[in-house]
Amino acid sequence: WLMIVEKECRVIVMLAKCYEAGKKKCQKYWPDSKDTLTFGQIKVFNAEEVRYSGFLVRKFQIESVEKMITMEVFQYQYTNWPDHSVPYTTSNLVRMHKNVIQLLAEIGGDAPMVV
């Protein structure tokens, strides 16, 4: 989260699930819906989770005590990638990509996207 705040990243794209075939593949680095986690001087509040066909969009409220800023960060998580394979169709992935591009156009700026 320190990197997110330092670079003012507004969008995170995640293509993996936390578990694949029962094995942990990714550390869950965000709080559950409507919960807050604190990472040093940074508080992360999961303000909203919206489920679409094939992906989730989470909206986080980030507060940096040290930098005295608050910011909104959006996380897109693709949830239809099958274990040890490739998606049967790309329609959900393409729809998520279009959502990300639209959001980037709306929020503007030149901050990097985290993938």
Swiss-Prot record:
Q: Could you say which enzyme class this protein belongs to?
A: hydrolase
Q: Where does substrate bind?
A: D83
Catalytically driven reaction(s): O-phospho-L-tyrosyl-[protein] + H2O = L-tyrosyl-[protein] + phosphate
**What GO molecular function annotation could you give as one example from this UniProt entry?**
protein tyrosine phosphatase activity
Alphabetic keyword roster = Hydrolase, Protein phosphatase
- Whether Lipid biosynthesis counts among this entry's keywords is no
Q: Which residues are in the Tyrosine-protein phosphatase domain? A: 1-115
Instruction: Tell me if Plastid is a UniProt keyword of this record.
Output: no
Q: What is its EC number?
A: 3.1.3.48
Q: Which residues form a coiled coil?
A: none
Q: Which residues form the signal peptide?
A: none
Which InterPro entries did the record assign?
A: Prot-tyrosine_phosphatase-like, Protein-Tyr_Phosphatase, PTP_cat
Q: Which family does it belong to?
A: Belongs to the protein-tyrosine phosphatase family.
Q: What is this protein called?
A: Tyrosine-protein phosphatase 21
- Which organism was this protein described from? Styela plicata (Wrinkled sea squirt)
